[in-house]
Amino acid sequence: MKPKVQNLIFDLDGTLLSWGHEPLPQTVTFLKELQKQGFKITFATGRSHILIRNTTQFIQPDLPVISSNGALIYDFAREKALHMTQLAPQSVVPIMRLLLQLEESFCIYTDKKVFGFEKPGIPCKRLRTTQSKIVEPDITQNNFTINPLTDASKFDFATQNITKILLITEDRGRISKITKHLDAIENISYVSSMTFALDIMHKDVNKAYGLKALEQQTGLDPQMTMVFGDGDNDVEIFNAVKYSVAMANGSDLAKQNATFISEFDNDHDGIYHFLQCFLKIE
């Protein structure tokens, strides 16, 4: 009996996107054909919705997207947030204090903007590269700013809806040390979605939490849904749907929790090859 799948949800970095940070042409063409056949496509990513917009220029999602690891559900069709779970101010204070002590670059994601912070005189290449990928209207609206780290102490977080704080470090060994300090802060969760990054959110937030909010907004059926991902932050959503696919380049934890593992990685049309076989579409 042919599996019933109506909805396809894709992580972005390391999954739908190649290492060149864009979806591959063969995969794009194939997914657009699936959309014509009635499949519903959307994304579930640690990225801010502002940093998803450039991908929507290749593939327009049929459903609202799960952004900030599940903290924000954003509908590009209506340009509005449908659901949001923010970090409490009493949690943000000790997080900010810790980050300033560490003197590492970081980003604050809100429902409207991304605020990046870097050491004065020491540009953070990852921050600069990410900022260069934003598209209109976010460029004109100045929705991604990069500021001196010293300005973070003056950031008025009490007036912002903060969905995620992203630590960026070139020293992978620091992450385990940082998490020990984060364990002492109440009502937060964290996950390392990439080797150089640590995502900090509200304690209830993960991609499965975001999926539940998407279900409530759209009526999406998780039993007719397939999710693709590659990272540790995909584990919860893998376990919340009928079918899950870890990319060939995925983490060990992602592969252990997936229904399937793709034969090819994100740089070799892994999604295209898997779906062509799974759906038996020529």
UniProtKB/Swiss-Prot annotation:
Signal peptide: none annotated. GO terms for molecular function: magnesium ion binding; phosphatase activity. Mg(2+) binds at residues 11, 13, 230. Phosphate binds at residues 12, 45-46, 207, 233. It is an enzyme of class 3 (hydrolase). GO terms for cellular component: cytosol. Its EC number is 3.1.3.-. Its cofactor is Mg(2+). Keywords: Hydrolase, Magnesium, Metal-binding. The active site is at 11 (nucleophile). NCBIfam families: Cof-subfamily (TIGR00099), HAD-SF-IIB (TIGR01484). Belongs to the HAD-like hydrolase superfamily. Cof family. This is Putative phosphatase MPN_383.
